[in-house]
């Protein structure tokens, strides 16, 4: 039985590896992310989950004394100007394809005028930034190309920036970018990932997915999210969750191979791939 399972696993990894090689050949572009971390310096990656509100209130000193990486609509929150993150990442196509969305337009307006400190913005390699960013914002590119297969192939793809674990959530490219920047210790906050608690199915068989954030989403964002999920079935959403949580284990394996320690500092987070450690006392 174990021999058959091993043979099956080998062919499965072979197929995944070939598929990944083809994807990288077609989709990957040159990236320009270089190590910048000082020796012993730790990075805090901030998801936008509801727990981030408590983290900001209870860990102001840690947040002020570490480089921060923010994601998605965080720049539209009032707290953003206080946090002054050095790094920012956008991955969802909505940020580059829909300037009719008031929240997206406000995001780019903020990148143009609100950032008064040096910041590096990471965006997918193939997108076109729809507006001119401010003088303090430096743009760098990453490849959001999902790579699966043999560990040696994944390691080469991840290390060269040609690909990453399947990026079903912005936190995946965020952590991988932190590793590429040379940080040997990474803390993750605001990564509740408790989406399954908010899933519902209406009497019309419409899946309702509420994804709360530390900031209050306006009605336009609720409408946009509802339209995205309008024709998606529950099994598709659950599979997406599966892919995201599995990707964290790929990150953990790769991080271990690079001597990088990733701590999940999000209270009650559903991510089970990384050891837990409170942000208080972060080195």
Where is each model-derived feature located?
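Metal-ion/cofactor- or nucleotide/acyl-coenzyme-handling active-site neighborhoods
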Residues: 2-283
